[in-house]
Amino acid sequence: RIPQYVTTIPDQTRVLPFLLQLLEHDQMLYGNKSKVIIFTSTTALTSAMHKMLESITSSLPGQEKTSVLCLHGMLSQTLRSRVSQQFRAYESAPSILLTSDVSARGVDYPSVTRVIQLGVPCSKEMYVHRVGRTGRRGREGRADMLISPFESGFVAFQLHDIPLQPLSMEDHAKSMNELVASNEAQTTFDASRVQTAMDHARYCVRETMDMRHLLNTVFNSYVAMRQLLRVSRLQILHPVQNWIRAVFGLE
């Protein structure tokens, strides 16, 4: 019932711009009702992407009204409960939750307009749980998954019976243009601000996080599921290195 899309991105420098386009698309569709969950594979990546998007929200259609929250297993139970309640309560301004799989099951967030997965999950079951956070109680919803080419084996063999639709970045850009031209967009944005915001956000993350630790945690999370991916450690290492470098602007 929920439209589900997978976008394969060979050029890692396009990952962050495309993620921002998905967020822009959701805010243009739903305005202040936009409520997006972004799933990542590790605690470190969740924290890094949270810092990144916190610095970029002013370039999104919702601008400073957009709230960006972070939730993962290293937070205390008290803090996790507080963040969950905050995200659950947002109804009159756009909100984004960066999270690990602690939010994939057993938590009911009403009115989530979109789920975005950065990379494949650890199992088909987890994929279903993640997607299940949107479109609840008969409401509209959508699921997007952004993958690198080395992850395509997981999609082909583990998610073969899931109604995933391939979505190219070009087709999505076309749908964005059509939305703007239709005058149905709830809000607009200034695309020229995005690059400046990305550069500043990358600098903030690099200055405050251990990038080697980040790389190791993401790499190890994929190594643990290499049989499902049907690739070797070496086939994982180089793409993950390129992904981290491109997304966070490393030399």
Language-model-detected regions and their locations in the chain:
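Conserved nucleotide-binding/hydrolysis micro-motifs of P-loop NTPases
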Residues: Q12-T13, T42-T46, L75-Q77, V102-R105, ...
